[in-house]
Amino acid sequence: HETDMSNSFQKYYKNSKNKLGKKLIEAIERGMKYSASQYTEAKDFMEQSYRSYSEVFEDYHGVITPASTGVADKGLKFTGSPEFCTVWTYMGLPSISLPLLTGENNLPLGVQLVGNKLDDLRFLGVANWLEKKCKDDE
């Protein structure tokens, strides 16, 4: 993940590092620490992970998971930890967080829907259906 990002941002890192944020610079630098063989090994493992998980989509159009450890923070300074979406991003699967529930102080509590690789149209249809279904049941 960080190696991909590091590769994508190399030009900006080399030419305009002073214009990048501290966290982005740190992530780019972490990504630069991996060799090409380590990167290839990780990509192979990622593909194996997807193949072992893809059987789920033979029977289901999507998987519902938590989107976070709790309700959203007030304001927009922090959007939350990516820990609940990282595994799906890692496997190349589409995911979306839907604010279907509410928690403390009436703040949204996201539900994450995960779809199959290269099946985005169906995935978006399922997300739309799920959101409407939950609102209809309120």
Language model regions located:
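Short helix-loop capping/hinge segments that flank enzyme active sites or metal/cofactor-binding pockets
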Residues: 1-50, 54, 99-110
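Amphipathic alpha-helical segments in well-structured domains
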Residues: 2, 6, 81-84, 127
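Structural helix-boundary/capping segments
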Residues: 34, 39-44, 90-138
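Short, surface-exposed loop/helix-turn segments at secondary-structure junctions
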Residues: 41, 68-87
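Small-aliphatic-rich amphipathic alpha-helix that forms the alpha element of a beta-alpha
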Residues: 52-54, 79-99
